[in-house]
Amino acid sequence: MAVLTGKVAVITGGSAGIGFATARAFRDEGAQVFITGRRKDALDAAVAELGSGVTGVVCDVSVPAELDAFYQAVREQAGGIDVLVANAGIGTAAPLGEVTEEVIDSVFATNVKGTIFTFQQALPHLNAGASVILTGSTAATRPDPGLEVYAASKAAVRSLARGWALSSRARGFRVNVVSPGGTRTPGLLELIPAEVLKQAEEGVPLGRLAEPKEIAAVTTFLASDASSYVNGAEFFADGGYAQV
């Protein structure tokens, strides 16, 4: 039987990349899925490709009022939330000496502030036993030059999960982190030259970057009842990159 049958799942940043692959995996496992994105055209295209069982809502996760409206729409259409994936995030490269206030503010607004409000505003709508999954990054453990601000934001996400896990008994949820390594998302493939991608692959013990569906598979496990006793943990889906 599909492992998410009857569950209502929310995925922020679901119009492309890992979020899109996660939405597809959840749909295939029987969940009713709601995804967010900031660009209506990309969101509409994602929903059209994913088909029935997936609903898209334009939402900026750094704006609590937009999240409130989104969660109210989910409740009206599907009821309470069983799985919440706080996946929306951005990464901006800025070498030391060239970091600006704008870089810090934009990265932390989405990756930290957005993650906090994605979870906090969802609290009244979570069903008992809900699984909350935050998207981290190997950058928090093994940062690359120029991505220190991004790495710091993802380290904050890991810390948030530890703190929130302490509230899980009283509030009836569990919270975990999935930290991908380099992943062959459309955005990465468009931005990174082929020779740089090859160098990145050589630094991974498995010798390749991840496919988005491989990250989605880990998230699906954490969303399912098979992980019912997993709480406050970080799952690295990185081919061993940050482990050796």
Regions found by a protein language model. Name each.
Residues R169, R174, V230-G232:
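Short, small/polar-rich loop/turn modules that mediate ligand/substrate recognition or access, typified
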Residues F119, S153, A161:
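Active-site helix of classical SDR
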Residues P124, L166-S167, S228:
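Alpha-helical segment proximal to the catalytic Tyr-Lys
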Residues P95-L96, T100-F108, A200:
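Substrate-binding pocket helix/loop in short-chain dehydrogenase/reductase
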Residues V8, S15-G17:
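Conserved glycine-rich cofactor-binding loop
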Residues S137:
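Residue(s) in the substrate-gating loop at a strand-loop-helix junction
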Residues R142, T220, N231-V244:
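Short C-terminal tail/terminal secondary-structure segment
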